[in-house]
Amino acid sequence: ICKPVRIGSFQRMMSMPKLTYFNLTGLGEPIRLMLAYGNIKYEDYRISKEEWAAMKAGLEWPHLPMLEIEGKTLFQSMAICRYLARQLNLNGRSNWAETQIDMTVDALNDFRAKVASYYYLPDGEEREKKKAVVLSEVLPLYLDRLEKQVANNKGYLVVGKLTYADIIFLSFIEYISYMLDKAILEKHPKLKEHHQRLKSLPGIESWLKT
């Protein structure tokens, strides 16, 4: 099992980071998982829709999640994840490795978005039709390829080591399974094994039990 590594400026943080997001998993959960993996204490502020409506006009970017850390305010979930990845040794060791990680993360975001596009449809009949397409076409398209990646990368998604792509995979698989009300990894044994291993990582295991 990989051990979390805290490096760089996190060793010298004077104030506790603050993550602001809604009281749900969504795009905030990959960040929470990375902070848990790094054993970084932070304020997990779950903002209400009413509070957010009053707050967002005064921000540099009206987007959540938002991470306040080391006197800086970070927006955009994947930018925040990349920032944390560099601090926690969850990034690539070369430009090419970084690019491979980015490609996988982009694919995971596309996967999540395609499932979410069905889940949030207001019309029930249309939603069921779209769900059938997601189950028959979208799941195999992404899961088959991700299964091959794990087989070819020493049990990880990319570059043969734990990266933030794996943490995002864990978060999104949980979210996608929830939206589909289905255990989606049963036909992909390597992904299923990887998923279970990620859930047992130090920090992450205890976070998932909260």
Residue ranges and their predicted role:
Residues 104-109, 192-205:
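Short, mixed-charge aromatic SLiMs
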Residues 133-134, 138, 186-200:
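Extended, well-ordered alpha-helical scaffold segments
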Residues 101, 157-184, 192:
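GST superfamily/GST-like fold recognition
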Residues 11-141, 152, 157, 161:
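GST-like domain detector, emphasizing the conserved glutathione-binding G-site
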Residues 92-95, 181-188:
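Structural helix-adjacent loops and short alpha-helical linkers that scaffold large soluble proteins
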